[in-house]
């Protein structure tokens, strides 16, 4: 299944940036495992966007629960499921 994860900042940018290196390490580790396919900070910096592939929502929720941003209380993740019909080639599905 494919998902868009919208990360909504719930703390000042200075607090977010203090945790950012650990967050990026978490994202990159799961990218190597094939979960996160693309990610970026939103512009203006009000949060982030992740494109994720996961067998199910529960698995993705567990990964997000271990994200340093979530553990640090600086983001609120919003998960949106979307159809893979038009993106299979783009994300290797």
Regions found by a protein language model. Give the residues of each.
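Conserved, structured core segments of small domains
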Residues: 1-93
């Amino acid at each position: 299944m494919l998902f868009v994860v919208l990360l909504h900042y719930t703390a000042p940018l200075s607090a977010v940036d203090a945790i950012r290196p650990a967050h990026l390490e978490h994202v990159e580790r799961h990218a190597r495992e094939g979960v996160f396919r693309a990610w970026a900070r939103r512009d203006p910096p009000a949060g982030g966007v992740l494109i994720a592939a996961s067998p199910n929502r529960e698995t993705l929720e567990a990964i997000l629960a271990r994200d340093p941003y979530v553990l640090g209380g600086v983001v609120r993740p919003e998960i949106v499921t979307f159809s893979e019909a038009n993106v299979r080639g783009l994300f290797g599905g």
